[in-house]
Amino acid sequence: MDLKTFIRNQFIENEFNRVDMLVRYHSIKEYLLDENYNFGIYKEMQEKRKFRNKYISRNILESLANKQEPPGSFEELSVSNFKTLISSFKEKGFDSAHPIRCNENGNLLDGSHRLALSYFYKLDEIPVFNISTTRQPKYSIKWFEENGFSDKDMLIINNEIDILKNYINFNDEKI
């Protein structure tokens, strides 16, 4: 599917509903500029999402099954897995064996990290897999406001939204 079209599908009533993808995008940019980047805003987002999110690292599951302490915090494991994905994507590109999952309306369900990397590398096309559901996660700017992100983080996020809108030629028309 065309990347810009897929991104446009993430606007619901003129509001970008997958700001979590932009936090990942911002983190990719910062990390590739400086390998010592601390992933602060990303870690905060992951911490605040973890109880809503069904995702639990395989490492954590294995540790729990073996009645051992997990090999690091959820946030540390999220960053480690993210760095591995960034490296793999940089080296090999998008692995089409792992398409981005979306609902029947084209709303992102699973694959926000891969979508952020696709946006970073400005791919023309991305592989998607449609799932027969209308369910959609909601991570609009309101979610970040309601979860107490700092003014500095909100400035970063709003700037990334503006850059994204420019990239897809979004002009606040009714979507």
Annotate the PLM regions.
Residues 1-74, 174-175:
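Glycine-rich short-loop/terminal segments
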Residues 126-130:
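Short hydrophobic alpha-helical runs that function as membrane-insertion/retention elements
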